[in-house]
Amino acid sequence: MNFTGQRYWLVGASEGLGRALAHKMSAAGAELVISARSETRLLELADELPNKAQVIALDLSDGVSVAKAGADLGRLDGVVFVAGVYWPMSANQWDGANAVAMAEINFTGAFRVLDQVMPQFLERDSGHIVITGSLSGFRGLPGAIGYGASKAGVMSLAESLYADLRTSGIKVQVANPGFIETR
């Protein structure tokens, strides 16, 4: 795919799949806005990329942090939400704090990011939204209560966006990868 002349916000860019996508998209001509929690990792990544990249550190569990990031975005052609956290948790080892944290980042974080881009996409009737779900969002898996539930929510969000926007100029995609070892 050729991204020449296009500006994308890549959320969850500091490591793993997000970092790999940043390299691929930049090599394909995209000007990126890269976001994640670690500004240090983002600055290192920006230095590695062949095209210009704006660094905006944020915390997806904090609505104020995401809104502040949104204020610095400018015009975008698309957003790729690949951020996510996973902490193994079975029903027998219930950890409510970790379950809520996964939902805050993986699911609510997607809403917060979309809140920053949807107004401009709707105004122009143009944009590209890519949201990363997971194969674990299709059905329950052992040891993945918080993660699987949050990814099922993200997948439903993407499908609902697609249903509402499919006849518009806004393209919506969901990617549901299997297990990817990122650390």
List the predicted regions and their residue ranges:
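Residue(s) in the substrate-gating loop at a strand-loop-helix junction
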Residues: 134
